[in-house]
Amino acid sequence: SATVSESNTPRKIEQHFKIKAGPGAGKTYWLIQHIKHVLNTSVRLGKIKRIACITYTNIGVETIHGRLPDCADRVEVCTIHSFLYDNIIKPYFHYIAPEYNFATDKMKVVDDTLLTSNGAIYQLKNNIRKVQIYKDDDALRQALFSSRWVFDGTDLKFKPPYPMKSSRYTIPQSFYDAYKKYAWEHGIMHYDDVLYFSYKLMVKYP
């Protein structure tokens, strides 16, 4: 059952909780107050341990930093991507990189930049059966831009939210798989790949 609390009501710091509220309801304010409460009352932090405050956007990081000006040395505020990269990918990725033929010597983390030049699309199309029927290269590019890692019930798949077509024919999964293989062989790790490889590392090395 849900418990309704006022934003200035301290919670037990060893108890899990979830906040559900609409825009402008004071979620960030409540979170800041809770962080301060943990800093003031925790018996486990000591002098060297820090609180990890993980958000999904850089704007969230900046907002929280701005509201905790005196706690920078005790609170690590970062996005989920930077947290996973610094604490999982950077120190441990080399354990699984060979499985994916990832060119670690060229590794570059990028956001939404995709390898979709004419040459890249040509190479990717060679992984599709009956390649000659997929003539609309722009549709293939759009399919890649629409794709994300999603859990299909057994594993993660890189694919669009719904089947997409090129020249009236549904683009097969092999095309999306080929893109990831192509990007990794060129040392490109997209933001979503940070989540993907972190998941793979935690599953293989729990």
Which stretches of residues belong to each language-model region?
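P-loop NTPase Walker
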Residues: S1-I96
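Residue-level detector of solvent-exposed, low-hydrophobicity positions
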Residues: K36-H37, T63, K90, V109, ...
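A sequence-level detector of short, solvent-exposed, charge-rich linear segments
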Residues: V38, F83, E99-A103, M107, ...
